[in-house]
Amino acid sequence: MLNEKITQLTEVLRSYFTGNRSRIECMAAIILGLLSAGTVNLSTISDFVKCNLLHESMYKRIQGFFTEFALCLDEVAAFVLFIIPMSGRLRLVFDRTNWKFGKSDINYFVLAICYRKVAIPIYWINLEKRGCSSDEEKIQLLKKFKNAFGFDRVSDLLGDREFISTRLLAYLEEEKVPYTLRIKSDHIITTAKGKEIRVDKIFNALSVGEISVIENATLLGSNVNLSAIKLRKEGLKVVASNHNPDQAIIRYEDREQIE
């Protein structure tokens, strides 16, 4: 039964991934092993998918797969979009995850697809440094997505305060990508009447739970809509968007629930 499942999955994977059949077959076994074992421990996975092989032989085969086979991110992304039942438009999210592995800093910048409050990474960069991603790195991931799928299906790009920048906003406007990005409350904007003012000053009269929207403001050289809410614990939360500003706070709250 397991051999049959591996064969079936291998045929599906061969439609999306390049490489010889043996490697694709090993990938199929690893995927089924992950689902069966519920762990990323390679030794445990080997027990679930060893078929007629000895445990040690299967373990070495899986190790060799990860050592010798480099996955193409475009192929991974295409496969993810195939297996996720999303017939409508896509919500993208910028995220960054970092942790320490011994003395090494692991710091990944990710472009993910939102699905049922889960962010599924499709493109990523190992920053190999501490701190945030650069404009070049943000636009690099967006261009990868554009080249593979285009932006026509994108309904929104969500991101936290660290991601917004002059160059990113200009790129999103140029490519007509809908976005909802949180901004810092000390940003300076120019109102439609030409008045320069700090974001926190323009929304300082908000009561807890109250939402306010300002349209056609200029932020970092781009025309944006600002939507703000005052929270009891967190204080002022402001997002910049280029579409449906009345729903921007709700859209961003969805981003905060994504894992």
Range-by-range predicted roles:
Residues K60-Q63, A112-R116:
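A short glycine/small-residue-enriched secondary-structure motif
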Residues A28, L42-S43, Y59:
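Short amphipathic alpha-helical segments
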Residues H55-E68:
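Major-groove recognition helix of helix-turn-helix-like DNA-binding domains
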Residues D105-L111:
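Short glycine-rich loop/turn motifs
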Residues L42-N52:
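DNA-recognition alpha helix
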